Amino acid sequence: MTGPVNLTAYFSNAWIAVAPAAFSYGPAILQVFPDAGSQAGGDTLYLFGFGFGTSPGSLTLTIGGAAATVQKVESLPSFASALSLDATYPFSLERITVTTPPGSPGKADISITASSGHATAPKYFQYLNASATFPRSGLYKFLLNDPLRQQVYLSATDHVDVFDRTAQAFRSPIEPPPNGPPPDAGLRGLALTPDGSQLIVADFGAQSVYLISPDGGANNGAQVPVGGVPGYANSGPARVAATSAATVFVGLSGEGGSTGGCNSCLGQMDLTASPPTLEPAPQPEVTSLTGAPLLQADSAGDTVYLAFGTAPGGPVAQWTAAAPNAFTVSSANDSSSDLSTSADGTLFAMRSMNATEIRGPDLSLFSTPVSAELEAIPGRVSVPGVALHPSGALLYDPFLDGPPPSAPPAQGIRGGIDIRDAHSGRLRLRSYLPEPFAMLSADVDGLHGNFLTTDENGEYLFALTTSGLTVIQLASMPLGIGSLSPASGAAAGGASITIRGSGFQSSTKATLGGKSANVTFKDANTLLMTTPVLSAGPQQLILSNPDGESVSLDAAFVAQ
């Protein structure tokens, strides 16, 4: 027997007392935070578990076979406040603080040898492929990945900086057309048309939207004045979403008091008109909705999800290219503060009162990820920029471990990213950034900033941090399930199913309804599966990789 066991005391009066996990046969590692770090080493990790002993000198700990430096060993009372645990917490938990050694990119085992024995936590830590900050002076608030050109756009106050992903260097910035930045410029949200030919930029300060060719050249763009919102001291466009119907939805925001609710904060721009002009969105389902909308389109521009956090009932909405003259609206009763859409358009994430919700294409809520006790970070602040893996399998949740400053520089705080399973909410990976996010205390929601995005495969993470752009490249993507298409079929089997997700390998295996299913690898985010003979009803899908990693999704497929 190894690991923690309960202690039970039996009394002559028939009473018993139980101390859960009060004794451990040798060391046992429960969790490690963070569980991703630089291949150069030097990161501080916290290992939680049992049977570690009391002296750092009596422990030997290795990560990927290389010796780590043990800083200290603590029993629960000394670190309870760091996890917001009180005296009612029943387990005799222990914590080791270590400094990571250098390592090779990929998953690594953590092994510990104590006077009481030895234990190994297989694949518990990931050395990142890359983690670097590229300095650039600017008050950045929003960023956008361009998969066609392999570029990242960063909106500064009066221009858009361009980061070349291949060269890992900044290129010449893009200035607002036609004659450079106006004196009152205040750039915010960014979007690309589905074909990538135009970069759409919202200028809150100048109350304009810019249509720009990212390739540059003469006459490479146009300015479309959109005006502000009556009754507000400051107002203008904050978010934009381009569609496959050659339209752009514009979310306007008002700040500094109002004489009434905003009844025209969702606008629609026709890109085929010359010149393009903005009008209030004409669809009857949204004409009566008030408040500044958060909005984002999928990569094809076929679906746009919206959230009206200040409107009565806190509604969410969906627009589709299949029915461009109508919206689907549902009352969510949420005070939404951030929103992100998966590139596939199969689901969207939104923040409400510091909780993150995952909703499906029918706008229904199916997941609200929460932190387990040991995952909690006291003083955690959500950073605008919640993101989804392109398939919808994973949620990228940016945070600070303390309040952001009112003005630069940020001191005494760290920035990090939690990667969670979008369906179950389970924490799959936590990584800290080399420096904090560039969030300021005024950046209260997704109308004021979007500090995190991913590449087209969810492998590269791009973060706006205090001195520029931080780029993280994961060495191993967490295995995840995003969606199945179609999600139902004949119980007789033989149906061809496309599985979208993350972390797929050529040797990934699948079981559906407890039966092995034939799988063909297409790419790291796509599998083709042939269904086996099944019983009628909903079926659980389980995917597994050769290193033992597995993930499941209940009712993933309905056999009919």
Q: Where does each model-flagged region fall?
A:
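A short beta-strand motif characteristic of beta-propeller blades
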Residues: 129-136, 169-181, 218-230, 275-287, ...
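Repeated scaffold domains used in trafficking and secretory/extracellular systems
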Residues: 138-144, 185-192, 230-242, 285-299, ...
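Short coil/turn segments that connect the beta-strands within blades of beta-propeller domains
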Residues: 148-150, 195-197, 245-247, 301-302, ...
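Short loop/turn segments that connect beta-strands within beta-propeller blades
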Residues: 164-168, 213-217, 270-274, 319-324, ...
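Blade-level signature of beta-propeller repeat domains, shared across WD40, Kelch, NHL, RCC1
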Residues: 442-478
